[in-house]
Amino acid sequence: MYLIEPIRNGEYITDGAIALAMQVYVNQHIFLDEDILFPYYCDPKVEIGRFQNTAIEVNQDYIDKHSIQVVRRDTGGGAVYVDKGAVNMCCILEQDTSIYGDFQRFYQPAIKALHTLGATDVIQSGRNDLTLNGKKVSGAAMTLMNNRIYGGYSLLLDVNYEAMDKVLKPNRKKIASKGIKSVRARVGHLREALDEKYRDITIEEFKNLMVTQILGIDDIKEAKRYELTDADWEAIDELADKKYKNWDWNYGKSPKYEYNRSERLSSGTVDITISVEQNRIADCRIYGDFFGQGDIKDVEEALQGTKMTREDLMHQLKQLDIVYYFGNVTVESLVEMILS
């Protein structure tokens, strides 16, 4: 099994979108006639399942405030928050594709490794999770691409659980969506379950311990590596920019949904029903007892096609004389209402 890590010119890359683009690029373009292991850890990131509605999975206000990355992966499953307190063990398996869909076999090397490190109470639970004393410490996903299994799982050493709790609590109200919602589960951490000699390890050390256990080697230096070339990295950068750092992929792929907001503003009650498709406003209707002079249909039409982001909504509404349409109301208050 080859080891590939996000190391570029001697520097460890912690950009989660780059890590994902690297895996996809290798799966599509690099064939070594052996299985490949991609372990990585990254800056705070929410990874969205391929078929999920980003808008209802995350608290966008919290994401914006704390500069947390949102990336949609190519495999299914639920939304997950990871940071430098988690190791993500991804792989390409081509030697035995019968493992596809069999999460028990897929997880076996990880379970064995964790037991060796002292976390003997880690077990597989449900279809694709690992739990420790009833708390989730890992979730897995896989897909079949190019006749190879592409999949992986996270291992929660000790992530920021406050951030995880807040970022995965959507704040939009009254949404009726056709998207698949994540199943919320209590989560735990692995650090406290490790043997005492491992409990103060860094995330880098934990990653290396898992790799050596899975590869059956004594030292990470013994691993058989494939070093990504400059040409590889250029292609990875391009893929990340075009897809995994692209708003249309990460947000615009969300299913259609509708929601309603009604709020008492300074000029009266404003009631707005919005239909969102590809995370842009497809249609909206505005009602209320506010004192405006203009035809509110002008505002409804102006909002059509606008991205559901604070920046785009502010820009679009500032093109209008909001006081003319709503009375003593600010653009900021309308945007806050739409996004609340």
Swiss-Prot record:
Its EC number is 6.3.1.20. (R)-lipoate binds at residue 136. ATP binds at residues 73, 78-81, 136, 140. Disulfide bonds: none annotated. One of its GO terms (cellular component) is cytoplasm. It catalyses: L-lysyl-[lipoyl-carrier protein] + (R)-lipoate + ATP = N(6)-[(R)-lipoyl]-L-lysyl-[lipoyl-carrier protein] + AMP + diphosphate + H(+). InterPro entries: aa-tRNA-synth_II/BPL/LPL, BPL_LPL_catalytic, Lipoate_protein_ligase_C, LipoylTrfase_LipoateP_Ligase. Catalyzes specifically the lipoylation of GcvH-L (SAV0324), likely via the ATP-dependent activation of lipoate to lipoyl-AMP and the transfer of the activated lipoyl onto the lipoyl domain of the target protein. Can also utilize lipoamide as substrate for GcvH-L modification. This is Lipoate--protein ligase 2. It comes from Staphylococcus aureus (strain Mu50 / ATCC 700699).
